[in-house]
Amino acid sequence: MFIAILTYKKPLEEVDRHLQAHRDYLAVHYAAGDFIASGPQTPRVGGVIMMKAESRAAVDSIIAQDPFNINGIADYRIVEFT
């Protein structure tokens, strides 16, 4: 199991421009069984995604598809746990 902790690098106005695409990405990975839970941090400085993946390489591949990653919106800190 992994947790991705996202920290926004861009102003919230720019985050909001990519939010629907990010939500669509989340929906795809929930449907595939990759994601268990997700949501924004409070205060709104980023988000958290709990995911099920076979390896860190698989996590990196999934994160590479996130519009927030593609557009330089967020940094990702990945934590593996058992």
Task: Enumerate the predicted regions with their spans.
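Conserved, structured core segments of small domains
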Residues: 1-82
